[in-house]
Amino acid sequence: MEPLQQQQQQQQQKQPQQPLLQMDAREKQGPQTRESQFLYASKLGTQPALLSITPGRPSGSSVLGPLARVPPATPVARMSEQSNVNSEPEEEEGGLEDEDGDDDVAEVAEKEAQAASKYFHMQKVTRQEPRATPMSSLLPVPGLSPQGQQTKEDHTKDASKAPPSVPTAGQPSWSLDEQLKQNGALAWSDDADGGRGREISRDFAKLYELDGDPERKEFLDDLFIFMQKRGTPINRIPIMAKQILDLYMLYKLVTEKGGLVEIINKKIWREITKGLNLPTSITSAAFTLRTQYMKYLYAYECEKKALSSPAELQAAIDGNRREGRRPSYSSSLFGYSPAAAAAAAAAAAAAAASAASAGTPALLSSPKIRFSILGLGSSSGTSASSPRIPPASTLRKGDGVPVPVPNRLAVSGTLAGQQAGNRPGPLEHLRERLESGEPPEKKASRLSEEEQRLVQQAFQRNLFSMARQLPMKIRINGREDRAEPSAPALNLTTSNIGSINMSVDIDGTTYTGVLFAQKPVVHLIAGSTPQSIGSSASSSNSSSSHCSPSPTSSRGTPSAEPSTSWSL
C-alpha cells in the first residue's frame, strides 16, 4: 500500500506543476507565433506593392530580392526547438495533459508548419529568379514606430537604386551600369539620336536661311512634302565641299539650263558649279552634282516641269559613259586635230618636192600610218598602164602603230608625177571632204586614205634617192604570189654612194648592170618589147650604163637580146 500511496502523492504533486509548465510554454509561444504570423502576413501584403513598383518585370518573377533569402532571426526554428524541449517532459509523464492543452498545441503546430512551408516555398522561388531586386529591407519590423518605418522605407528606396555593397555568397551583384544596360540602354541611344537630330535640324534651318529669296521657303516646303508623299523623305541635307548643298539654287540652275538630261548632254556642269559658288578644285564635281540631283530633285523636276523622262536620263548617262571610254579624235591619228590635217599633208608634199629638187633623200613616212604593198599592172604595148593602188584599210582603234620602212617595196614602173596630173589634187579633194558635213569617224577614215596616197607618191618620187643612201634592196613586181609570171622584176642594190647595181627580170630573162646617178629625178622608161627598149635607148642623149643579159637567160642567146639603156 505504501508504494501506491507514494505514487499517488507524487502524481498529485506533479499535476499542479504540469499546468504551470504548459502556461509558461504558452506564454513563451504566444508572442513568437504572433510575430511569425505578422511577418508572413506583411510579406504577403508587400507583394502587390512591389509588383506595381517594378512594371518591367515578367509576371512569373518573384518580388523578393536576394537579401530576402536570408531568414530574419528564424523565430520558427526557435519555436520548434522550444516545443520539442517542452514536449519531452510531457511524453515522459505519459500524456496526462488535459484535452484543451492538446488541442491548442496541435493548432499551433499546424500553423507553424504551414508558415514554415510557405516561407521555404518563397525562398525556393527567389532562388529560381536571381534578378529579383533586394526588397527585403522594405518589410516592416515590429517594435518600430510608423515614422521610423517610413524613414527606413525612404532609406531602402535610396539603397535599392545604389548597388549593394556586399553581395551575399553565391548571389550575383547587380550594379547600376548593368541595370542601365538592361533597362535604360534606350536612353543612351535616344540621347545620341537626339544629338544627330539636332544637327540635322540645324542643317534644315540653314538651308532655309541661305538667302532672302521669298520663293525659297515655298519651294523647300513643297519639295519636302512631295518627297514625303512619294515615300522617299529627305532625312538629311547633302553636304558638298564641307558646306550645305543648296537644293533650291541647284534646282533653279538646272531647270534654267533645260533640265538634267540637257546638262548631261551638253556637259555644262562647270557653269552649275560656279552658280553654286563651289570651289573649282572639287574632284568629280559633275558626278557628285548629278547623283545628288537624281536623288533629291529629279523626281520633283519630272513632276513639276516634265523636262525629261527617266528613259531619256538613262540614255544620256549611257552615252556619256561611252564617250568617256572613247579616245579623242585629236589623238587617234597624228596627235593633232583633223582640221590641221590638210596643212600637214601640204607640208608633206612640199617637203617631198623640195627633197626631189635638191637631191637630198627624204623619208616621208608618218610614224602612225600602216603601209600596204603596192600592186602594179604589167606594161603592155607602148603605153604604160596606170598604177593600181589598193584601197586603204579601214582605220580602227589601235591601228596607229609605228612601222619601220620596208626593205622591199613594190613601186610603179612609170613616173608617179605623170599619173599625179591625171587625177584631181589630193589636197583639194581632202579639203572638200573635210568641209562637207560628214561624221568625224568617216572624216578620219578618208583622211587616212588621202595621207596614204600622198605618202605612196612621195615614195615613188624618191625611190632612187633613198636607194643611194640606204643599203636596201627594192624588188619591183617581184611578189612570188602574183598570178602573172611574166611580170617584170627589178632588184636594186647599192654598192656605193654613186652607183646602183640593178637587176631586171623580164619574161624570164634577167638583165643586170650598174647605174650611175647624174640627175636627182629618175625617168624610168620600161617597155614590154625589145623594140621599145631599143628605141628608148637610142633616143637617150645622156651617158648610160648598158645592161648585159645574164647567162642564165631562158629565152634566146645573149647576143640576140638587144641592150637596154636607162637614162638617168
UniProtKB/Swiss-Prot annotation:
Which residue intervals define the domain ARID in the entry? Answer: 213-305
**Residues bearing the modification Asymmetric dimethylarginine:** 370
Q: What happens when the gene is disrupted?
A: Embryos die before 11.5 dpc and display various abnormalities, including wavy neural tube, small branchial arches and defects of cardiovascular system.
Annotated region Disordered: the residues are 1-174, 378-403, 529-568
Q: Where is this region: Interaction with RB1?
A: 201-374
- Record's subunit section: Heterodimer with ARID3A. Interacts with unphosphorylated RB1.
In Swiss-Prot or TrEMBL terms, this protein is called: AT-rich interactive domain-containing protein 3B
Q: What species is this protein from?
A: Mus musculus
